[in-house]
Curated annotation (Swiss-Prot):
GO terms for molecular function: rRNA binding; structural constituent of ribosome. It comes from Mycoplasmopsis agalactiae (strain NCTC 10123 / CIP 59.7 / PG2). Belongs to the bacterial ribosomal protein bL9 family. The gene is rplI. It comes from the Bacteria. GO terms for biological process: translation. Binds to the 23S rRNA. Keywords: Ribonucleoprotein, Ribosomal protein, RNA-binding, rRNA-binding. One of its GO terms (cellular component) is ribosome. Pfam families: Ribosomal_L9_C, Ribosomal_L9_N. This is Large ribosomal subunit protein bL9.
Length: 151
């Protein structure tokens, strides 16, 4: 029996056609809402759904590329305080974390979740490039500039 999966399950991904035994297909997959029986009507529905998905995918990819360009033009600046101890070592107080970077990006009007930004714990001064996952395989390089004020 051929069925069209409409949800991801152990047998395959959604929107794929698989061959299963008659009992498994009708009693489990179709009954539980994981699949539809394969016929001309459902085949046309699948083709329409796949064309809609590809059109939506292209739209999302285009907007992600635009967002990548905007992010790569941005530069975030942070100031950290430091002091010099008796042994002439520089002790930096605080650090720039992923949470700080996400908050700054949200203030600038970007809509990103905390998992989109590479986990960081920046203490050293200078310009750092941070990876921001904009869309599946599209990664932007965000400039983070850290300035250390010595007291």
């Amino acid at each position: 029996m051929k069925v069209i999966l409409i949800k991801d399950c152990k047998d395959g991904k959604a929107n794929t056609i698989i061959e299963v035994s008659d009992g498994y297909g009708s009693n489990f997959l179709i009954n539980k809402g994981f699949a539809l029986p394969y016929n001309e009507k459902t085949k046309k529905q699948l083709e329409k759904r796949l064309s809609d998905l590809t059109a939506n995918e292209m739209e999302m990819r285009q907007s992600a590329l635009e967002l990548k360009e905007k992010l790569e033009k941005e530069s975030l600046k942070y100031e950290l305080e430091a002091n010099i101890d008796a042994n002439s070592n520089l002790n930096v107080h605080g650090a720039v974390s992923t949470k700080d970077i996400v908050k700054s990006l949200v203030k600038l009007g970007y809509k990103l979740d905390k998992y989109a930004v590479q986990k960081v714990h920046l203490v050293g001064r200078g310009v750092h490039l941070i990876d921001v996952i904009v869309y599946k395989d599209i990664v932007a390089k965000l400039k983070v500039d850290i300035i250390i004020n010595v007291k």
